[in-house]
Curated annotation (Swiss-Prot):
The gene is ADORA3. GO terms for biological process: G protein-coupled adenosine receptor signaling pathway. GO terms for cellular component: dendrite; plasma membrane; synapse. Its main location: membrane. It comes from the Eukaryota. Receptor for adenosine. The activity of this receptor is mediated by G proteins which inhibits adenylyl cyclase. Signal peptide: none annotated. Residues 38-48, 107-126, 198-230, 284-317 are cytoplasmic. This is Adenosine receptor A3. SUPFAM superfamilies: Family A G protein-coupled receptor-like. Phosphorylation on Thr-315 and Ser-316 may be crucial for rapid desensitization. Phosphorylation on Thr-315 may be necessary for phosphorylation on Ser-316 to occur. It is a multi-pass membrane protein. Keywords: Cell membrane, Disulfide bond, G-protein coupled receptor, Glycoprotein, Lipoprotein, Membrane, Palmitate, Phosphoprotein, Receptor, Transducer, Transmembrane, Transmembrane helix. Disulfide bonds join C83-C165.
Amino acid sequence: MPVNSTAVSLASVTYISVEILIGLCAIVGNVLVIWVVKLNPSLQTTTFYFIVSLALADIAVGVLVMPLAIVISLGVTIHFYSCLLMTCLLMIFTHASIMSLLAIAVDRYLRVKLTVRYRRVTTQRRIWLALGLCWLVSFLVGLTPMFGWNMKLSSADKNLTFLPCQFRSVMRMDYMVYFSFFTWILIPLVVMCAIYFDIFYVIRNRLSQNFSGSKETGAFYGREFKTAKSLSLVLFLFALSWLPLSIINCIIYFNGEVPQIVLYLGILLSHANSMMNPIVYAYKIKKFKETYLLILKACVICQPSKSMDPSIEQTSE
């Protein structure tokens, strides 16, 4: 069937080309995010530590996940556990992203609920513990199939060693649906939506009360409202990018097959999320836009880059 063969080949080439483009954009964009935070002291706050963690996860998607996804799409014959490790790495950085988003949401919640005690609660030690916990959970969830929850145990051929490396050849779909999606993606997404709903509710109440006309307090909650809007947009884009692929996995598990082109589109959309956040920061956070321009001058116009003056307007923590 030469027509079908050509169609599949064309779909694969298109998929690989788009993956490479997305990967490059994700790497460049998120390296810029980290560079911006390094250059701008007003962005070196608790929330932006978690944003840097999210950027690192997105860089890993560009550097590791997308090349591995391309190898898996080609079905290269390798050892079972090498293939399984590759697919587990795909899972680790997905969960690192959602854990970082959850940490950001909790941080903003503490900021508006504990306005006076916030700095005492969010100590440097606790920030590093939270970051470590995010990544520890991500590795444990992502590497769970390596400890037995994989296709080798459910395969009729227990001596299976080498095989064409494809996602469903090694990864069990009940792990993907019940453990990865329902437990570690869907539940955190619902929790984060509830957190942001409460943040907006608290800010709206405080602004309507106006605190006896205190301009300083009004300005604080105004900044918090803008920050919460920007970060909730990041969360919305994550959900928009990852839910389609998760739903496709549910369809495969409960109902059978989906067209290969639909699967490719779901994968590409999920990976595209890694290049979206730097764009959101540039458009929604003034300090990011200013520092992006500073870097552009340094790189394109050959002016030396330097840290921005910490005395300039501070981003709310």
